[in-house]
Swiss-Prot record:
The keyword Secreted does not apply. Signal peptide: none annotated. It comes from Pseudomonas putida (strain W619). The lineage of its organism: Bacteria, Pseudomonadati, Pseudomonadota, Gammaproteobacteria, Pseudomonadales. Belongs to the bacterial ribosomal protein bL27 family. GO terms for cellular component: cytosolic large ribosomal subunit. It holds the Pfam family Ribosomal_L27. GO terms for biological process: translation. This is Large ribosomal subunit protein bL27.
Length: 85
């Protein structure tokens, strides 16, 4: 016979690994082609001139230059562009 009563199990103790999302390079920083600028879920930031978007909505530099963040359009969307240096 057991000398201790069986303890119940907890339903806690899990957590997902962080995805390291966010802005990786900021305005007026110099970037090379291929540098990641923003990692995001969905389009919080839209791709402007000289910026490409990956299938997971990651924004990356297509040309070398200086990053420019701006709001424009009817819905005040945030765009990331690259100005050639």
């Amino acid at each position: 016979m057991a000398h201790k009563k069986a303890g119940g199990s907890t339903r806690n103790g899990r957590d997902s690994e962080s995805k390291r999302l966010g802005v990786k390079m900021y305005g007026s920083q110099v970037v090379k082609a291929g540098n990641i600028i923003v990692r995001q879920r969905g389009t919080q930031f839209h791709a402007g001139y000289g910026v490409g978007m990956g299938k997971d909505h990651t924004l990356f530099a297509k040309i070398e230059g200086v990053i420019k963040f701006e709001k424009k359009g009817e819905f005040n969307r945030r765009y990331v562009s690259i100005v050639a240096a």
